[in-house]
A protein has these predicted regions:
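Basic- and aromatic-enriched surface patches that contact anionic nucleotides/nucleic acids
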Residues: 6-7, 18, 54-195
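A short, surface-exposed helix-loop junction/capping segment
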Residues: 44-53
């Protein structure tokens, strides 16, 4: 058997459009405060073809939100975000850019909500909002390293609604989901240990 080349492997990919998309992507880092100020952020990603939003509504509990903020303070790894960077043209650097969130809506919404003082974390039994933090602590949230996989889309070569769905499914449903019984069993251990 002859060697298999990268070109040959790419030809086996049945989703030709995804090969095109994958060649127009990159890994970058953002800081929440700059990300929020520099881009139009599309949290819902409306799929015009289907009259439906790609993203579910915000569903995280207060505890989940607080845990994410603590994770940032503690320097724990945060999973990468996935965005589609959409601009009308590759050539115009001064235009408005929209960042569509493909993966990470709950996390990014939580970060923005904390920055807007919409919920507190608990420190020594006291509620602590973003406004209550000193400059260094606020800096930790405003400028934490938000790693992201970014797919680039332009009016002359846009990422289609179908392609957005395929990318979303890749990041959200590609693995084997945990069995409910296994998940409940693990949660039961936590319930026992906190009593």
């Amino acid at each position: 058997m002859s060697q298999i080349t990268l070109r040959k492997l790419e030809s086996f990919n049945t989703l030709t459009s995804l090969r095109r998309i994958d060649k127009s992507q990159g890994t970058v880092s953002f800081e929440p405060i700059r990300f929020r100020n520099w881009y139009n952020v599309d949290m819902d990603v409306y799929l015009e073809k289907y009259d439906y939003n790609l993203q579910r509504p915000f569903v995280w509990t207060l505890l989940q939100q607080q845990e994410l903020i603590w994770s940032i303070f503690m320097g724990r790894p945060i999973p990468p975000f996935v965005f589609i960077h959409h601009a009308s043209s590759r050539m115009n650097d001064n235009e408005s850019v929209t960042m569509q969130i493909i993966d990470g809506k709950q996390r990014l919404t939580t970060i923005f909500r904390y920055m807007d003082n919409e919920f507190p974390i608990i420190v020594d039994g006291e509620e602590v909002f973003f406004k209550d933090l000193d400059r260094m602590a606020q800096h930790r949230i405003n400028f934490f390293d938000m790693r992201a996989q970014v797919y680039y889309s332009y009016n002359e070569e846009p990422i289609t609604d179908d392609e957005k769905i395929v990318i979303f499914n890749h990041y959200n449903f590609a693995g084997t989901p945990q069995e409910e019984e296994h998940k409940n069993r693990l949660y039961s251990f936590l319930d026992v240990s906190t009593k």
